[in-house]
């Protein structure tokens, strides 16, 4: 429940940002401006990821402090579940609302909805099987992350097939920049956290957020 509350709060902010792009994406398709539509979709995805990353990374890095500040009794595995949910949300953002809006603008959404829905629904039976075979509860979140990425990439393939989106542009304009920012942002705060600011204090939390 705690993990879901954190996820809903963060994703609500991102959804409001992405919704603002929807009218222009639809308008670009209606006027035949596919290049502008694709560019706006990639910009929306990139900035959504970066905004979410800036919110999620400090939270995950200081998750124990935040949970103890928020709750009296922290549920078992709450910290791990929140971190995994944030990772799942970041993966979903990479292939999220702008692609959905793009496909909706075409009107050809039946096959797309069927395929992507089936992929997402696979999380439930496979997660159940994993738990029945004695896997930890966190395994369900790992399974969710995997299928979120698969569903997202399939969503892009439909955009490529129906609209003409370019994989090369996706890599150049979205995946490469966000990968670069993510990789470069991780080492220093993590090093400082575990070598200089291990104590769970408000001052250390604020310092890490600034870094």
Model-derived regions: residue spans:
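Helix-loop junctions and terminal segments of transmembrane helices
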Residues: 3, 7-45, 98-105
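Residue-level recognition of pore/gate-forming positions within transmembrane alpha-helices
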Residues: 5-8, 43, 56, 65, ...
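Helix-terminus/linker motif at the lipid-water interface of multi-pass membrane proteins
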Residues: 1-9, 27-28, 64-74, 193-197
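Membrane-interface helix-loop junctions in multi-pass transport and translocation proteins
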Residues: 110, 117-153, 160-161, 165-167, ...
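Membrane-interface junctions at transmembrane-helix termini in multi-pass inner-membrane proteins
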Residues: 86-119, 163, 167
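Transmembrane helix-bundle signature of multi-pass secondary active exporters and lipid flippases
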Residues: 1-19, 23, 51-55, 85-92, ...
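Alpha-helical transmembrane segments of multi-pass membrane transport and lipid-handling proteins
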Residues: 14, 38-94, 121-129, 182-191
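Interfacial/gating helices of multi-pass transporter permease domains
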Residues: 1-8, 39, 73-82, 204-207
């Amino acid at each position: 429940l705690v993990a879901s509350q954190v996820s809903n709060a963060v994703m609500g902010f991102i959804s409001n940002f992405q919704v603002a792009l929807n009218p222009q994406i639809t308008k670009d398709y209606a006027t035949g401006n596919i290049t502008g539509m694709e560019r706006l979709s990639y910009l929306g995805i990139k900035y959504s990821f970066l905004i979410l990353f800036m919110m999620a990374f400090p939270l995950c890095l200081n998750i124990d402090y935040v949970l103890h500040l928020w709750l009296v009794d922290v549920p078992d595995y709450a910290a791990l579940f929140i971190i995994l949910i944030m990772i799942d949300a970041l993966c979903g953002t990479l292939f999220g609302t702008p692609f959905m809006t793009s496909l909706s603008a075409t009107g050809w959404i039946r096959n797309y909805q069927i395929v992507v829905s089936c992929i997402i629904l696979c999380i439930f039976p496979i997660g159940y099987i994993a738990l029945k075979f004695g896997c930890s509860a966190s395994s369900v979140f790992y399974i969710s992350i995997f299928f979120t990425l698969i569903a997202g990439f399939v969503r892009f393939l439909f955009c490529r097939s129906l609209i003409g989106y370019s994989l090369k542009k996706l890599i150049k304009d979205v995946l490469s920049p966000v990968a670069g920012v993510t990789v470069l942002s991780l080492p220093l705060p993590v090093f400082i956290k575990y070598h200089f600011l291990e104590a769970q204090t408000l001052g250390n939390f604020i310092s890490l957020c600034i870094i």
